[in-house]
Amino acid sequence: MENTNQFLGTERVGKLMRRYAVPCIISLLVGALYNIVDQIFIANASYLGSYGNAANTVVFPLTVVALAIAVMIGDGCCAFVSISLGKGEVGEARKSVGSVVVLSAASSLVLTALYLIFADAIISMFGGTVNEETFRYAQEYFFYISLGIPFYMFGQAMNPVIRADGDPRFAMISTLAGAVLNIILDPIFIFECKWGMMGAAVATVLGQIVTAVLAVWYLCRMKTVKPGKGDFRLHASLCTRMLTLGITSFLSQISLVAAMAAINNMLRKYGALDEIFSQEQYAQIPMAVVGIVMKFFQIVISIVVGMAAGCIPVVGYNMGAGKKTRVRELFTKLLLCEAIVGAVALVLAEGFPRQLIAVFGAANESSYYTDFAIKAFRTYLCMMVLACVNKACFIFLQAVGKAFSSTMLSMIREVVFGMGFALLLPRFFGLDGVLYSMPVSDVLTFVIAAVMIVKTYRELNTEGAAVL
């Protein structure tokens, strides 16, 4: 089969960034909207309110576990396919796509079974016992979300593979179709049918099914790396290489889950010691508030990750073809764009927190909810620029084949700093300590990331001149 991706090594870098990054950003934003839209409609339903918001916050990390596995498989395959095409090894690329289908199906079924069997214990582990209402809502939401895990994981795993095949537009459309259906069904199920948390979850699952079906349709019509019947099996050596390339994506997401578990439990623990939030009717507020702050953060990070991940096929192809100058140029543009995104997000979080929380039903809540939410936005997100640059650095290192460096940097951010400070700082500052944990982590991570950025520039500088 002819390699039709040669333009990745000749087209202007800026044009390639727009072509690949924009659809990827939209895909990730739309994917993020599943949970965000659920939370918006849940929060604005007076019969659910902050209890439903808190329940959504409890369950959200558990969907991230599924996403972590899916992106490890999909991003790893995307990088592998791009590098293989750059080397002219189309057959290897086809085999890797077949392995993705089998691997995503098997892993999603195992995860679904674990979620259904150990649901109550898992919900408790992620802070769902803050009060009885929150636990009950979390149980209901988690059950139906678990049933959709196989569709969700397959759609997410195939999305980067479709981009690597040279059709980022279809990758965007498949995700957009499911999200649009979710947005349409959410208000119908929550407000008209009064299905509550079940309605939000069912709307989400139906949207995920649509995305998965479209991914199957594309799989049968792939342009460059369509697998043959014999390719639909687990090729051990290829799987190892793919998962190695995708391990950073996995650890980045899964370590975020660990950090969120720590944060949720610290909110529950130190909220119980607070004069206001120790009262039963207000106990869920800290968790609900941090949940909406994280949703805003998720929107921003979707743009950041989409921009960087969208460049993976371009980086992989040019690295495989030995065109380091083009890779260096792309890295420079990427860092600049990510810093701009972070600056815009910072202005919104610091200058307009009241307007942001109003989207999540603040009108139905007490002044304690609003006051804590404003403080959370301004404190938790005060280092957004550094957070965006850090994230871009993680993904770019992965794209150029430095899986170990990327993995270590990601783990240091989320586990050593993120989880560590989430557990440590509340001992000294109470609930405020949870809010301080993110900016402190981002500053310390940037110090390490800056060293990696300089080193990467030097390695990509084929003429040996200093770049930074």
Residue ranges of model-derived segments:
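Short alpha-helical transmembrane segments in multi-pass integral membrane proteins
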Residues: 1-21, 81-148, 192-247, 315-383, ...
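Helix-terminus/linker motif at the lipid-water interface of multi-pass membrane proteins
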Residues: 29, 33-54, 123-132, 188-194, ...
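Transmembrane alpha-helix boundary and packing residues in multipass membrane permease domains
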Residues: 24, 28, 40, 79, ...
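Residue-level signal for short hydrophobic patches within transmembrane helices
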Residues: 14-33, 37, 62-69, 147, ...
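Small-residue-rich hydrophobic transmembrane alpha-helices
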Residues: 53-113, 152-171, 287-347, 351-353, ...
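Transmembrane helical elements of multi-pass membrane transporters/channels
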Residues: 19-38, 144, 178, 207-211, ...
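Small-residue hotspots at the loop-to-helix junctions and early N-terminal turns
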Residues: 50-61, 138, 142, 201, ...
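Short runs within selected transmembrane alpha-helices of multi-pass transporters and secretion channels
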Residues: 27, 145-163, 171-179, 200-213, ...
